[in-house]
Structures are given as structure tokens and as C-alpha cells.
């Protein structure tokens, strides 16, 4: 049931509550416990996750638990146009997604141009997804800190 907030003259219900949208984003470094925390908080099993390291190109658009979006980006997204299509499709087709992605922009900047482009695309995609997500959780040492 959506929470109804009211003022003196009007009632307000957020659009995400009306449409049943509830996207959550978990970000953090490699091996920090993002998947385990997401499963616990959302009553999911690890076996339910779409593992992006070896998933099909279309799998993430129907999966409720997307693990390793950075792997998907490395495998399938190579341009700004593909980035925009990915973001648009995820927003339109997967309104209940739990998205888990490693932070790949920290550390030494790679010499290889493709690696730099991959890191930039991943960062830009995650920035856009976080803007419209209902929750964004940063995970460090298995502990989630809500940043949105």
C-alpha cells in the first residue's frame, strides 16, 4: 500500500509508489559482500541472481536480482548510444530490479584506452541508474550504508 502524504490542500503519492517501481542499487568494491547483503535485505537467494559475467544479452531486462552489472557493461556496452539504450531499457522494462555493481573507477587509471573507456561507461551508467533508484546502498566489509 503506498504511503499517502498530505498537506492542507492536496494528497501526494510518489510516481514510483503508483507504478510499483522499486529499484535498488548496491555498489562497492570487489568481494565486499554486496550480493549477500542484497539477498538478506530483499529476501532473495543467491541462486536467483542473474550473474552478468555469463548471462545472455537480454537476461538483465527481466531479472529481479542483477549481480555484476560491470561485467555486463564490459561484455555488451561499447558506445554512448549503447549506454543510453541500456539505461532506457532497464528503467522501462525492469522496474523492480536489484542492481549490484562493483565500483571500478577507483584506483590507478589504466594505460589502455579501452579500459579507461569501460570504467567511464560503467561510472556514467551507474550514475544515471542511481539518479532514479529508490535506494542506493554502498557496501564496505559487508556493511551497507544507505546513501540514498
Describe the function of each predicted region.
Residues 55-60, 144-147:
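A short acidic, often aromatic-flanked loop/helix-cap motif at beta-alpha or helix-coil junctions
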Residues 49-50, 75-78, 114-116:
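Short, flexible loop segments at the rims of nucleotide/cofactor-binding pockets, characterized by
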Residues 20-53:
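Glycine-rich P-loop/Walker A and Walker A-like loops and their local beta1-loop-alpha1 context
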Residues 58-98:
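Conserved nucleotide-sensing/catalytic segment adjacent to the nucleotide-binding pocket
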Residues 32, 71-72, 105, 144:
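Short, solvent-exposed loop/turn segments at secondary-structure junctions
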Residues 1-22:
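N-terminal amphipathic/basic-hydrophobic helices that include classical n-h-c signal peptides
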Residues 29, 69, 101-103:
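Short secondary-structure boundary segments
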Amino acid at each position: 500500500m503506498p504511503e499517502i502524504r498530505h498537506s492542507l490542500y492536496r494528497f501526494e503519492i510518489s510516481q514510483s509508489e503508483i507504478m510499483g517501481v522499486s529499484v535498488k542499487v548496491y555498489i562497492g568494491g570487489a568481494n565486499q559482500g554486496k550480493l549477500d547483503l542484497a539477498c538478506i535485505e530483499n529476501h532473495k537467494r543467491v541462486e536467483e541472481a542473474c550473474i552478468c559475467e555469463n548471462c545472455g544479452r537480454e537476461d538483465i531486462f527481466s531479472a529481479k536480482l542483477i549481480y555484476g552489472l560491470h561485467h555486463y557493461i564490459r561484455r555488451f556496452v561499447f558506445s554512448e548510444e549503447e549506454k543510453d539504450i541500456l539505461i532506457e531499457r532497464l528503467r522501462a522494462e525492469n522496474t523492480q530490479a536489484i542492481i549490484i555493481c562493483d565500483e571500478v573507477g577507483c584506483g590507478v587509471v589504466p594505460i589502455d584506452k579501452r579500459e579507461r573507456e569501460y570504467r567511464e561507461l560503467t561510472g556514467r551508467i551507474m550514475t544515471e541508474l542511481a539518479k532514479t533508484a529508490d535506494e542506493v546502498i554502498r557496501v564496505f566489509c559487508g556493511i551497507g550504508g544507505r546513501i540514498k
